[in-house]
Regions:
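Phosphate/adenylate-binding glycine loop and adjacent helical scaffold
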Residues: 1-223
Length: 223
């Protein structure tokens, strides 16, 4: 999967270039336009088959906020193109899966090529209640391929080498599966009210964290 963005656009679209038979999965509702040799179909966003697969997808959607369906894109010949619009205006980055695997916060997924996939990992009750983004589930990548993650604003990569860092939960986009993490209130309930700081993620170990420069929750509160 090759992808391109138009630097002349303030909030650029992402255009994917596909060869014959190449398959990608995209966030439902993100398609803007595509060439005639590209076909789209809807797939259940869950493993398994039959009724059990449907119930699993819908049930997980109810508690995580994630869509029950995902869009499959297939190019019938070379030079297939499809353009995508992220849910929020901001930077799009590739995460190369294989030796490295990641977890993603809710809303960060844009596209994934056909050789990689993701599952929804059940979080602990404490993480789910404090997290406020993915609910009881967090997206976990597996396999080999490329995943496109989008953010609200610009993205900065933070690298840890047996270190620890605390980050506002609303600014976290993705992080390495090699990192341990917990979600909690900064300095307790009353201190959080006084400082205006809320739920934070503390990461420990060795790996990468991708953070976004803007806070979508804060922006929504201004509207």
């Amino acid at each position: 999967m090759q992808f391109f963005t138009d630097s002349n656009m303030q909030f650029p679209l992402v255009e994917l270039s596909l060869n014959q038979g190449e398959t990608v999965f995209i966030q439902r509702g993100s398609m803007v336009y595509h060439t005639p040799n590209v076909t789209l179909s809807t797939k259940l966003n869950a493993s398994g088959s039959g009724l059990g697969r449907f119930v699993k997808a819908v049930g997980r959607s109810m508690v995580s906020g994630e869509s029950s369906f995902i869009t499959q894109v297939v190019s019938q010949s070379n030079n297939g193109y499809i353009a995508l619009a992220p849910d929020s205006p901001g930077q799009v980055i590739p995460l190369y899966l294989g030796e490295k695997q990641y977890r993603l916060n809710d809303g960060a997924f844009l596209a994934l090529d056909g050789t990689a996939y993701y599952t929804m990992e059940l979080q602990s009750v404490g993480k789910a209640l404090f997290g406020g983004q993915g609910g009881f589930f967090v997206m976990t990548t597996q396999g080999q391929g490329t995943l496109l993650a989008n953010a609200y604003g610009s993205i900065k990569k933070i690298e840890l080498n047996n270190q620890e860092v605390t980050i506002d939960n609303a600014h976290v986009v993705a992080w390495s599966q090699t990192l341990d993490y917990d979600i909690h209130l900064e300095n307790g309930f009353w201190q959080s009210i006084g400082t205006g700081e809320g739920v934070v993620n503390t990461f420990r170990g060795t790996g990468e964290i991708y953070v976004q420069s803007l806070n979508l929750q804060t922006f929504a509160g201004l509207l």
